[in-house]
Swiss-Prot record:
Residues 30-44, 130-140, 189-209, 459-472, 491-515 have a biased composition (Low complexity). One of its GO terms (biological process) is spore germination. GO terms for cellular component: cytoplasm; nucleus. The keyword Disulfide bond does not apply. It comes from Aspergillus fumigatus (strain ATCC MYA-4609 / CBS 101355 / FGSC A1100 / Af293) (Neosartorya fumigata). This is C2H2 finger domain transcription factor crzA. The gene is crzA. A zinc finger (C2H2-type) spans 548-570, 576-598, 604-635. The keyword Repeat applies.
Length: 754
């Protein structure tokens, strides 16, 4: 405030040809180099306006208000020495070669700028102050008029102690910022708002217009002639926002932790100005020390037209160890700074644990050296040094900077166990024949087979007798597991459900209650080696074999009565005549059936009751059984008996589940009448229908045409042959008729049906 009261006119803008330059490290031409020399000692010596030379009258005057400052004498008072300058080296006519050499070395003038400016600068420094002032007036005649009214002619009114009473090293008040955080040699400098220059270059006559265009400020609002525009500059030092030492990287010499920086540094206590393009002291302005300036416009974006960005060797020289970082070196110890120093959790740092939190797992890490008990070896099979997992042995490493990123990934080595010399998992398996298709022995199986499995019965039969234990041999010719078709006799003795032996299902085998039992049952029926599948099986052996052969045709019959009725068909003998119409028939059964038509009685009705309730059929009535059979073979008749077929299928599945739950044997074949003739289309009548109309069991389906019945068959000859049905017996292809019932063998005449 004292400087503002003494120089009230300093707030005005300078002449159009001159712009006030602030604290800049840019080596300008002759005029700006002298400005920077004065500004270097500004915070320690004087408060004159930037860019002004001392007048000769002021330089020779001896009546200063401050008696410690005498420019003509070499004696410096103690107060002047405390400011760090000597009058002989600064204001005397003697060339200050040492000062020039130090200042010239501190500036790195790039080769792109004219080197002819340096001799001009050095030659002018060797002249006395008065000659320099005259030379300055000859070179720039307009500058004397611009700055002549800025200095007071009375030299006694300059009170330098009053101006710099708060920034001297001997002052009682501390500066606004910590001097240890600054890299600039001007440690105690305070920038006045009128002394801070704008970002535009000055129009010096010693700079060519081409250089002015090249090194102009990159600001979007800057023009070469706009020097009268006044810019707003806030009242704080540029070191608080541009000093690299106040960045987030700590050094080992300043503060040990983040709390000291955040608590003691004044740069983090105040408000920072937002980035601006027109402010010189904005935090967005790049620093000349910052070589990592992210700009895609080249070096023309630098704030100084004559100084390229350069590194600060004290801070940015291999600060983070990026220059020495390689991906191939996994165990490299980085000497830079890490976010681990920060009290805040970094999202880029992997979680780490100390030694006291890590469990002592033998397969994951090495045991601690001071364990109370010996650690068991990692080698499970006694192979030596190699275990199941090849991990590093040793103590847990302490938590270090970047320790999580330096850990090598664990490697897993899979080693197969050596072959066991001692059988530890039960008896060894017998050598099986690879050519056989038999299942494995039941001794190694944990669960038994289902009841419909044909292999389940022989596996349990060896428990009852020692003589059948040899059946486990897969090469035995009489084994039930053999695929030979000639071992059915041995199968009957072991797996016949009708044998005298105890039921194999009552043994100590666990039964399966799977939901696909019907599938196993169907597969068992399709097995040609299943019990009862062979015609030589005791269950399927006919009690009356077809031993009566016809000498005129290949038909065979079980009874002599049936053979005689058949021979009448060849001789066309019809001894049985109808009493109503006189129609003759070869069989007694055919005449009785024909006489029923004359009476009008139709006792064959397509209707019946279901076991679960309800009725089936269409209700049509037929006088003959063959007419009802033809009806069932038609499309309408198939729809009529479909409820019976569905009910029978459900009953079969229910009975199969009951067998498995109650350890019962498989049921015998369902009472059906399968038709083996290919012309019949495998027509099968339900068992309930056959039980309701037993006459349907004796029908010769191969001789019944699949057409509508003809009720006018009274006078004509019957379409049947002379046999009554019972006399034909069982042929080779009619073996399915034997499973209907046993009533057919008891009839000696056809009249017993009625």
């Amino acid at each position: 405030m004292a400087s503002q009261e003494m120089f009230p006119e300093l707030g005005q803008s300078p002449a159009p040809g001159v712009k006030s330059r602030g604290v800049s490290r840019s080596p300008h031409p002759h005029q700006q180099q002298q400005q920077q020399q004065h500004q270097q000692h500004q915070g320690q010596f004087t408060g004159t306006v930037t860019g002004l030379d001392l007048d000769s009258s002021i330089a020779t005057a001896s009546s200063f208000a401050n008696s410690s400052f005498d420019p003509n004498s070499n004696n410096v008072s103690p107060s002047a020495e405390s400011y760090g300058y000597t009058a002989a080296g600064y204001l005397s006519g003697t060339p200050a070669s040492q000062t020039d050499q130090n200042y010239a070395n501190s500036l790195q003038i790039p080769q792109s700028y004219g080197t002819g400016l340096v001799p001009q600068f050095n030659e002018s420094r060797g002249l006395p102050i008065q000659q320099q002032s005259q030379q300055q007036h000859h070179q720039q005649p307009s500058l004397d008029d611009n700055f002549s009214d800025l200095l007071n002619s009375n030299a006694t009114e300059y009170d330098f102690n009053t101006v710099y009473q708060t920034h001297s090293p001997s002052s009682n008040t501390a500066p606004e910022y910590d001097s240890s955080l600054l890299l600039d040699p001007q440690v105690h400098q305070q920038s006045h708002p009128t002394q801070i220059p704008s970002s535009h270059s000055s129009t010096s006559p010693q700079i060519s217009p081409l250089e002015q265009q090249q090194h102009s400020s990159p600001g979007p609002m800057s023009t070469q002639g706009s020097t009268t525009v006044a810019y707003y500059t806030p009242q704080h030092s540029r070191h608080a926002s541009l000093d690299p030492a106040t960045a987030a990287f700590l050094t080992s010499n300043t503060h040990p932790d983040w709390q000291a920086v955040m608590g003691n540094s004044a740069a983090f206590q105040g408000h920072r100005r937002a980035p601006s393009e027109v402010s010189e002291i904005s935090s967005a302005a790049p620093s000349p020390y910052l070589s990592q300036h992210e700009s895609f416009d080249g070096v023309d974006n630098n704030p100084s037209p004559l100084l390229a960005p350069q590194n600060d060797p004290s801070l940015y020289d291999s600060a983070l160890g990026i220059e020495n970082f390689t991906l191939s070196e996994q165990h490299q110890q980085h000497q830079g700074f890490s976010p681990a120093h920060s009290p805040y959790i970094s999202p880029r740092l992997m979680p780490q644990q100390g030694q006291e939190m890590m469990p002592n797992v033998p397969y994951l890490s090495g045991p601690a050296p001071n364990t109370q008990y010996p650690t068991p070896p990692n080698d499970m099979y006694g192979n030596g040094a190699e275990g199941m997992m090849n991990m590093s042995q040793g103590t847990h490493p302490s938590v270090d900077i970047g320790q999580a990123s330096q850990m090598a990934p664990p490697s897993i080595n899979v080693e197969f166990a050596p072959p066991s010399r001692i059988p530890s998992f039960g008896p060894s398996k017998p050598a099986s024949n690879l050519d056989s298709l038999s299942p494995p022995p039941s001794s190694t199986r944990s669960r038994g087979r289902s009841k419909s499995d044909p292999y389940a019965h022989p596996s349990t039969s060896r428990l009852r007798s020692s003589s059948t234990s040899s059946s486990l041999d897969p090469l035995a010719p009489t084994t039930p597991r053999s695929l030979s078709p000639f071992d059915s006799f041995g199968r009957q003795q072991q797996s016949n459900p009708s044998s005298r032996d105890p039921s194999p299902s009552r043994s100590n085998r666990r039964l399966s209650t799977s939901s696909i039992d019907s599938r196993n049952y169907i597969l068992g029926l399709a097995d040609p080696q299943r019990p009862g599948a062979s015609p030589n099986d005791s269950k399927r052996v006919q009690k009356h074999p077809a031993t009566f052969q016809c000498n005129l045709c290949p038909k065979r019959f079980t009874r002599a009565y049936n053979l005689r009725s058949h021979l009448r068909t060849h001789t066309d003998e019809r001894p049985f005549v109808c009493t109503v119409c006189g129609k003759a028939f070869a069989r007694q059964h055919d005449r009785k059936r024909h006489e029923g038509l004359h009476s009008g009685e139709k006792k064959f009705v397509c209707q019946g009751e279901l076991s679960r309730g309800g009725q089936w059929g269409c209700g049509r009535r037929f006088a003959r059984a063959d007419a009802l059979g033809r009806h069932f073979r038609s499309e309408a008749g198939r729809i009529c008996i479909k409820p019976l077929l569905d009910e029978e299928s459900q009953e079969r599945e229910r009975s199969l589940m009951d067998q498995q739950q109650h350890h019962l044997q498989p049921l015998p074949q369902q009472v059906m009448v399968p038709v083996d003739n290919p012309h019949a289309g495998n027509f099968v009548l339900p068992a309930a229908l056959l039980a309701q109309y037993p006459a349907l069991q004796t029908l010769q389906w191969d001789q019944i045409a699949a057409s509508a019945d003809d009720p006018s068959d009274i006078g004509g000859r019957s379409s049947f042959d002379a046999s009554s049905g019972n006399e034909f017996g069982f042929e080779d292809d009619d073996s399915g008729l034997s499973s209907v019932s046993g009533i057919n063998a008891g009839y000696s005449a056809a009249g017993n049906f009625y």
